[in-house]
């Protein structure tokens, strides 16, 4: 990686850390925090920083599959997502963050995940987007207080307000994309005050990053004073 001038890596750690604060979460083949530190130091000596991605709000089966954490599920029958309205959700997630940041001390970022998830807050009556932004603001505040820049997968706010599809349709005409945005943009912008400004919105698109719908979305973030980063792999 040094040869190719790579200077930063996001490592999706999930259960591959032997967590000290929530030891049940680490898998049997997980690396210890000290082993991760050695890897981080090795990379740092080569001008490469490693930052952790600790999955939440969804992709949380590595935590919620355990009996101990079942009460934190958004849907009691599914281990996919945390309940963003339960304060204990944040106690657990922050413990995982603390250990991950200790394991990877040279990173600049804390990637909090947040993709491919829709929650109800145990049928709270709040919308999925409202709930996600409640969660996002809390975890972004934690990241900032820990000295890290939070990164968030941006797909769900876009999907829940109807502007997601054009990003993956490079054959869609500019006029059609603009029409979809003109119809739905107001729904997205109604939530703008709740979008944390200290966050990087990571615009992932592995198949059609050049699509007009994708570049238009990235420009929307910039136009509204939000930081955006592309992820093509």
Name each model-derived stretch.
Residues 54, 205, 232:
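Residues at the C-termini of beta-strands that transition into short coil/loop
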Residues 2, 41-45, 101-105, 189-196, ...:
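Acidic (Asp/Glu)-rich catalytic clusters
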Residues 151-220:
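Substrate-binding cleft/loops of secretory-pathway carbohydrate-active enzymes
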Residues 1-155, 163-164, 172-173, 200-202:
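Substrate-binding cleft of carbohydrate-active enzyme catalytic domains
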Residues 116-122, 198, 219-233:
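Active-site clefts of carbohydrate-active enzymes
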